[in-house]
Amino acid sequence: MAAFKATFFLLLVVCAMVITTTEAGVRVRPCDQVCSRIDREKDECCRAHGYSGHSSCDRGRMTCY
């Protein structure tokens, strides 16, 4: 029973982390134009708009976290 509780708890923690990570990414339209540039410039654009850094660029759409 203790193993079941521990497994359930770990699964719950992992699910919470996935949900939090998914919600953290925000599209920043002004940064779309820097998607083709180096990572440092992408991070700078996201920081200039109040985010910690860039998460990804997908089809020319910048996602910041």
Swiss-Prot record:
The keyword Signal applies. Disulfide bonds join 31-46, 35-57, 45-64. Its main location: secreted. Coiled coil: none annotated. Expressed by the venom gland. Residues 1-24 form the signal peptide. One of its GO terms (cellular component) is extracellular region. Keywords: Disulfide bond, Knottin, Neurotoxin, Secreted, Signal, Toxin. It is found in: Secreted. May act as a neurotoxin. The presence of a 'disulfide through disulfide knot' structurally defines this protein as a knottin. Belongs to the asilidin-1 family. This is U-Asilidin(1)-Mar3a.
